[in-house]
């Protein structure tokens, strides 16, 4: 049972930058758009694709335990842009939206049900504001949002944002966003936008690795 984690944020909020503290051989990066990273590092395990089947195969095949899909929202956008012209109108459009929602839903379900428990898959997505003013992951509109509540498939949703010129992760909802995490997984409501720290906290919480303080106490 793999763990899917959603990271949302505006462009420039620091989502991709949060990967910076992973070692070059520590992370498997799936680039949906193929854009360069915003820091001087190249991850040895990098794959560029926007094909759902290719993504699923890559998730299964890689021995890496930390995996990032950046930007996962463009799996949705690219599918729509590549197929909407041929969908026509009426039922064709609804069929396309059903297919788009189904494919993303199946990918998250695949992570949960088919990957080993030590694999954590981070879905990086842009954020959007709905008509009620709530901050949520950006999709392609109401037709898709009515079919599947993306954030509802994730136990952990962190929001990347800027606070006084500092890039941070929000770990607890403000009441106007979909940020959430299990009780006591993170010590603070805000933390540095360091996905390596997040990854460590998740693994400690679920007992995949020992807490650093326990290891330190054991050595003394």
Language-model regions: role of each:
Residues 71-149:
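P-loop NTPase motor core
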Residues 27-29, 121, 157-159:
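Short, well-ordered beta-strand core segments
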Residues 130-220:
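Conserved GTP-binding G-domain of TRAFAC-class P-loop NTPases and closely related GTPase folds
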Residues 65, 119-120, 151, 155:
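Conserved acidic residues
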Residues 18-20, 58, 113-115, 147-151, ...:
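A general structural signal for short secondary-structure junctions and capping/turn motifs
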Residues 42-46, 117, 153-154:
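A short helix-to-beta-strand connector/capping loop
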């Amino acid at each position: 049972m793999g763990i899917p984690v959603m990271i949302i944020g505006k462009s420039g909020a620091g989502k991709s930058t949060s990967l910076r503290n992973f070692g070059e051989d520590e992370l498997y990066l799936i680039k949906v758009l193929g854009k360069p990273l915003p820091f001087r590092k190249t991850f040895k395990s990098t794959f560029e694709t926007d094909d759902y089947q290719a993504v699923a195969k890559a998730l299964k095949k890689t021995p890496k335990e930390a995996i990032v899909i950046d930007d996962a929202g463009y799996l949705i956008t690219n599918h729509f842009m590549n197929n909407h012209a041929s969908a026509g109108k009426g039922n064709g459009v609804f069929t396309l939206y059903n297919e788009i929602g189904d494919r993303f839903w199946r990918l998250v379900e695949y992570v949960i049900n088919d990957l080993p428990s030590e694999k954590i898959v981070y879905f990086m997505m842009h954020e959007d504001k709905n008509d009620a003013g709530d901050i949520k992951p950006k999709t392609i509109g109401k037709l898709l949002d009515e079919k599947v509540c993306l954030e509802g498939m994730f136990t952990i949703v962190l929001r990347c944002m800027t606070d006084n010129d500092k890039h941070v992760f929000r770990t607890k909802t403000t009441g106007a966003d979909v940020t959430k995490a299990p009780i006591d997984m993170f010590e603070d409501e805000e933390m540095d936008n360091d996905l390596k720290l997040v990854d460590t906290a998740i693994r400690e919480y679920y007992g995949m690795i020992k807490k650093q303080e326990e290891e330190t106490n054991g050595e003394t």
